[in-house]
Amino acid sequence: SAPANAVSADDATAIALKYNQDATKSERVSAARPGLPPEEQHCANCQFMQADAAGATDEWKGCQLFPGKLINVNGWCASWTLKAG
C-alpha cells in the first residue's frame, strides 16, 4: 500500500503534471517526452527522482517536483526527463 506521504491523485501539482502512480494508466503516450519511447518512460529513470528521500522504499521514492512527498517508481508525469548516464 502507498505510504502516508505518497502523492495523491487529487494533489494540485499531480493534476497539473498529469502524474499517475501507474505509468501504464498515464498520458505518457499522448504527452510523451523526448529521450525514450513512451512505454519506457517512468519515474525510476527520471532525473527528478530522489532515491534517498526520507521514507523512501524500493517502490516509493522522493521527487524534486513533489517536495516532502513520495512518488511510485512505476509512475509517470508530464515533466519526465531522462536521467543522465
From Swiss-Prot:
UniProt keyword terms in alphabetical order: 4Fe-4S, Electron transport, Iron, Iron-sulfur, Metal-binding, Periplasm, Transport
Top-level lineage group: Bacteria
One Gene Ontology biological process: aerobic electron transport chain
One example GO MF annotation: 4 iron, 4 sulfur cluster binding
Location within or outside the cell: Periplasm
Transmembrane regions listed in the UniProt entry: none
Pfam families membership: HIPIP
GO CC aspect terms: periplasmic space
SUPFAM superfamilies, per the entry: HIPIP (high potential iron protein) (SSF57652)
Binding site for [4Fe-4S] cluster: 43, 46, 63, 77
Keyword NADP: no
Membership in a protein family: Belongs to the high-potential iron-sulfur protein (HiPIP) family.
Subunit relationships: Homodimer.
Function: Specific class of high-redox-potential 4Fe-4S ferredoxins. Functions in anaerobic electron transport in most purple and in some other photosynthetic bacteria and in at least one genus (Paracoccus) of halophilic, denitrifying bacteria.
Protein known as: High-potential iron-sulfur protein
Source organism of this protein record: Allochromatium warmingii
